[in-house]
Structures are given as C-alpha cells and as structure tokens.
Amino acid sequence: MNAFLLAAGKGLRLRPYTENTPKCLIKVKNKPLLDYWLNELDKINISKIFINTHYKSEMVHSHIRKHKSFNKIKILNEKKLLGTAGSLFQNIKLFKDDNMLMIHADNYSKFNILNLINAHNSRPKQCLMTMMIFNSPNPKTCGIVEIDKNKIVKSFVEKPKKPLSNLANCAVYVLSKKFFKEFKQNENFYDFSHDILPKLMGKIFTFKINESFFDVGHIKTYNLIK
C-alpha cells in the first residue's frame, strides 16, 4: 500500500499563521501537522509516501528531508495548483498499481489508521474505496454523507444548507486499484469532493471514528486546538 499526503494548499483562511509557514507545517501542540501523519504512517507497512507541494514548497522539502522515512517519500511539486483531484489523476501512473491511502494533511485527529485499513479490506465487493467519517458538531461546514445499513454512501453533499445527517467526510480515504480504473485518465478533474465523490454513490464504504476530528484549514478551529 502507498500513501498520498495532500500538502500543497496556501492556507489563505489561516492567515496570519500561514504568511510565513505552509499550512502543513503549522504546529498543533508544538508539532507540525505533517509530522502527525508521517508518524502515523510509520506505524504501518507503507511502501511509498507521495507528498504534493506548492506554497512555500522549499520549506516543506527541507522539513521532509529530516524525517526518518525520507527514503520512502517522493515529493510531487506543483508549479500550478492542480486541486485535490487534479493532483491525484495527474500522477495516476504512480498510483494505479496498488491500494492507496489518500489524506488531506491539514486535518488533525488521533485515531488508529490500521483500523481504517482493516475496514477497507473487509468492505463490500462493489465498493471501490473507503471513506473515513465522524460525527460533526457543525454539519453545515462539512461534506455530509448518508449511509445505508451496510455503511455504504448513498448520498453526499458538500456543506449542505439543510444537512440530512451529521456524518461528515474526514477527507481520509483508502482507494483500491479498481478505483483508478473507474475514470479516464484525461478527464478534467480538479476537486475530489465535487468531481469524484458524487460519481461513486453506492461504491464508497465508510469507516466511522469516535475520536475527535478537526479540519485545521479554518482559523477558528486552529485557535481552538493549537
């Protein structure tokens, strides 16, 4: 299994904290966000870790070079932001031959990532991917799912005005090899939540965590947990 950490964002909603620091390197409890994810990946059998970069990329590259798993890491620098789906499909030749963890690195949570992988391995056969979800106290600010009795997503709406549930997308996924065969490589994808997820209703398994989960892309959330 490989992993793809999305770390290219500019963090505009986190100013002034991101004026001189890339979003993935801002600190939560005195540790850069990126390190939480790298340390979690160190606990499991990951073959290769891909990290996309853009904003203040040299700072991210310098930080990654110091990590003990640097020999497993491949940096994918984007001269122009490709978006969460664009980054994935621009590099599909690197990803398509193995299962892959896809993680938005500007999130923070303490959960056991191995439990997510085990859930994915026991998913119903029609499901191409597994989405980690949590109970959101503010569902209007999240991507909200409805699931059936088998924990399969039957609807997904990004930031709904009238949420039909409080089950929210963590933006942490396990993608199967079959997932990559579902789409044409030359399709013009940009955002994973808007361009990909809605096309996969009935094919997304879910794994719900009970731990707290935070989207650190918002300054209000960051001030709450930093």
Q: How would you describe each model-predicted region?
A:
Residues 2-5, 13, 27, 31-104, ...:
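Conserved N-terminal catalytic core of the sugar/cofactor nucleotidyltransferase
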Residues 8, 54, 134-135:
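Histidine-centered beta-alpha loop that forms part of the nucleotide-sugar donor binding/catalytic region
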Residues 25, 145-147, 197, 206:
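A structural signal for short hydrophobic beta-strand segments in well-ordered beta-sheet cores
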Residues 27, 133, 146, 174-176, ...:
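Short, well-ordered beta-strand micro-motif
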Residues 101, 108, 114-121, 137, ...:
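Catalytic-core segments of class I nucleotidyltransferases/pyrophosphorylases
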Residues 124-134:
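A short, conserved acidic/glycine-rich loop-to-beta-strand motif
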Residues 142-154:
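Conserved catalytic core of nucleotide-sugar-dependent glycosyltransferases
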